[in-house]
Structures are given as C-alpha cells and as structure tokens.
Regions:
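Catalytic metal-binding acidic patch
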Residues: 25, 30-49
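Basic nucleic-acid-binding interfaces
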Residues: 10, 48, 89
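A general structural signal for well-ordered alpha-helical segments in protein cores
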Residues: 6, 20, 50-53, 77, ...
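Short hydrophobic/aromatic patches at helix-to-coil boundaries
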Residues: 85-91
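Conserved beta-strand core positions
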Residues: 21, 38-40, 68
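Metal-dependent nucleotidyltransferase catalytic core
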Residues: 3, 44-75
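Helical scaffold of the NTase/Pol beta-like nucleotidyltransferase catalytic core
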Residues: 1-21
C-alpha cells in the first residue's frame, strides 16, 4: 500500500478513535479485484460509539473511492473470528 494512502487511512482512523488498524479479507489475501470492498479491523478507544465507527466507515469510503467494511474484534462473528485474526495485516 502506498505510504500516502496508509497515512491517510491512519489519520482518518485517529479522528474517530480507532487504533491498531488492520486489513483482512480479499485485499489482505491478494485476491481483490476492482469490485472488492476493503475490510478493516480496528480497536476503538474507550468511550467511542457506533456513530464513530459509522463515521470512520463513511470517511474511509470517501477517501478510498471503494466500499469499506469496518469491524471491531468484538463485532466479529465467532465462525470467522480465528480466520480474520490470522489473516489481518497492519495498515
């Protein structure tokens, strides 16, 4: 990922209290195409809300020009949790 994009993603994440930003899914596996969304796994600062998570998602989509999903470890479904944690790569 280009350094400028990485910095932009991390700046947006910081505005919403998101840390430890990681990518998982088809982008992390190198299987993405132009229709693929980008899946982000984040840790949110204490006191942050779903509004922060939603704002983060909207701003990332605007910046990247692609659909984005943002989840926390708590928000991961049990059946995919171990796979996501295994394949997640830091931004």
């Amino acid at each position: 990922m280009p350094t400028e994009k990485r910095r932009q993603i991390l700046d947006i994440a910081a505005r919403y209290g998101a840390r430890n930003v990681r990518i998982f899914g088809s982008v992390a596996r190198g299987q993405a195409d132009e229709r693929s969304d980008i899946d982000f796994l984040v840790e949110m600062e204490a006191g942050r809300s779903l509004f922060d998570l939603g704002g983060l998602q909207a701003d990332l989509e605007a910046a990247l020009g692609r659909p984005v999903d943002v989840v926390t470890e708590k928000g991961l479904k049990a059946r995919i949790r171990s796979r996501v944690l295994r394949e997640a790569i830091p931004v």
